[in-house]
């Protein structure tokens, strides 16, 4: 029984959690189409609701490598000083690559991940170290994430990129699979804002995730309230960070395999 569950983890879909990635990759020639919707809401003294939406095409290339292409839409609704509601919308494109170094079936699964994204006048680079391990019907995953955010600016008649923000995030997730089609667990995220080498805050999120799946599809839902700012600074002295981050995030993913 333990071996059969390890095989399920190793060979099935590559996504189990709403936020945390696993080391699985699609077999060569297989591809997924995924629809993402993330709502972020709750700012201090302000109405705020952001919707991040993605359409993803993901394909296995063989040799433990897969790639994916995303079309992204970002919309924000927020109240201004006069309590009027304003809205902004941006579009973007992303390309990710994942290389599985080892599988979680008999030892710790290890994968390396890289993503480049374009959004308005911003260019983003993201890397992940992915670790996971299956224990019978349980799956544990850990991600260490580093980002580099570059923003285009024009100064003195010249174009330049401002690369001040380098956030770091640590993600930990655990899921128990009650049967081959349903699992439930928890995810915890520690997001650290770093700018110009200064560690500004450390925002902790914790919430449940469910995964419901069939042979050719899956549905994932994640609810993630902000718990606390565990690294208080002069710039961010509060118990929570609710100006640059939101009180609550919720995500739904629907995927189809071919």
Predicted regions and their residues:
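Cleavable N-terminal export/targeting peptides
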Residues: 1-17
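Transmembrane beta-barrel domains of Gram-negative outer membranes and organellar outer membranes
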Residues: 12-257
């Amino acid at each position: 029984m333990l071996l059969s569950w390890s095989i399920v983890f190793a060979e099935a879909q590559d996504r189990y959690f709403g936020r945390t990635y696993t080391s699985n990759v699609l077999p060569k020639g297989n591809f997924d189409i995924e629809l993402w919707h993330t709502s972020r809401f709750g700012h201090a003294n302000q109405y705020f609701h952001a919707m991040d939406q993605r359409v993803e095409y993901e394909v296995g290339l063989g040799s433990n490598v897969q790639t994916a292409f995303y079309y992204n839409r970002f919309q924000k609704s927020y109240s201004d000083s006069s309590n009027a509601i304003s809205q902004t919308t941006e579009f973007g494109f992303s390309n990710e690559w994942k290389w599985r170094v080892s599988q979680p079936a008999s030892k710790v699964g290890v994968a390396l991940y890289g993503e480049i994204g374009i959004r308005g006048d911003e260019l983003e680079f993201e890397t992940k170290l992915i670790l996971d391990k299956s224990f019978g019907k349980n799956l544990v995953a850990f991600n260490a994430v580093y980002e580099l955010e570059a923003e285009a600016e024009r100064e003195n008649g010249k174009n330049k990129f401002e690369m001040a923000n380098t956030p770091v995030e640590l993600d930990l997730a655990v899921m128990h699979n009650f049967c081959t089609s349903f699992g439930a667990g928890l995810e915890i995220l520690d997001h650290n804002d770093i700018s110009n080498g200064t560690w500004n805050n450390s925002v902790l999120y914790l919430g449940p995730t469910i995964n419901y799946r069939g042979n050719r599809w899956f549905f994932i839902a994640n609810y993630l309230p902000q718990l606390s700012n565990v690294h208080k600074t002069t710039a961010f002295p509060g118990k929570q960070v609710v100006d640059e981050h939101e009180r609550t995030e919720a995500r739904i993913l629907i995927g189809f395999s071919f």
